[in-house]
């Protein structure tokens, strides 16, 4: 469950290291975002000499949350951190690599490019 002011790790090589959620895309008064939701975030920590800079406002899709994800078959998935992948306006990832495990629910939400870059799909 990601809400505004939540810090997230970045799970790609776009140049950002930490993000802070400032808005959840969707309904005007959505309180929480879950895996697969698109958020508006500000970069709080970035690698020097990369295209993304600190205090830049970007869009990102959530790929891991500490809150459990319950599937229809009864299995529950929980990750150790909150993480997101930086995307552009069309939904394509800005980085060329994705780090860590990615849930297969992202494929159903049309983030197939992120799923194809991931080393492991759970």
Curated annotation (Swiss-Prot):
Binds to 23S rRNA. Belongs to the universal ribosomal protein uL14 family. SMART domains: Ribosomal_L14. One of its GO terms (biological process) is translation. HAMAP family: Ribosomal_uL14. The keyword Phosphoprotein does not apply. Pfam families: Ribosomal_L14. Keywords: Chloroplast, Plastid, Ribonucleoprotein, Ribosomal protein, RNA-binding, rRNA-binding. Part of the 50S ribosomal subunit. Its main location: plastid. One of its GO terms (cellular component) is cytosolic large ribosomal subunit. PANTHER family: 50S/60S RIBOSOMAL PROTEIN L14/L23 (PTHR11761), LARGE RIBOSOMAL SUBUNIT PROTEIN UL14M (PTHR11761:SF3). It is found in: Plastid, Chloroplast. InterPro entries: Ribosomal_uL14, Ribosomal_uL14_bac-type, Ribosomal_uL14_CS, Ribosomal_uL14_sf. This is Large ribosomal subunit protein uL14c. It comes from Capsella bursa-pastoris (Shepherd's purse). The gene is rpl14. GO terms for molecular function: large ribosomal subunit rRNA binding; structural constituent of ribosome.
């Amino acid at each position: 469950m990601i809400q505004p002011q939540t810090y997230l790790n970045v799970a790609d090589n776009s140049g950002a290291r930490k993000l802070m959620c400032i808005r959840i895309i969707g309904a005007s008064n959505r309180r929480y975002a879950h895996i697969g939701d698109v958020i508006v975030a500000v970069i709080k920590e970035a690698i020097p000499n990369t295209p993304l800079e600190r205090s830049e406002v970007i869009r990102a899709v959530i790929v891991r949350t500490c809150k459990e994800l319950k599937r229809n078959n009864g299995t529950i998935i929980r990750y150790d951190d909150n993480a997101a992948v930086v995307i552009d306006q069309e939904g394509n990832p800005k980085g060329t690599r994705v780090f860590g495990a990615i849930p297969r629910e992202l494929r159903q939400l049309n983030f197939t490019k992120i799923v194809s870059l991931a080393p492991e799909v759970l």
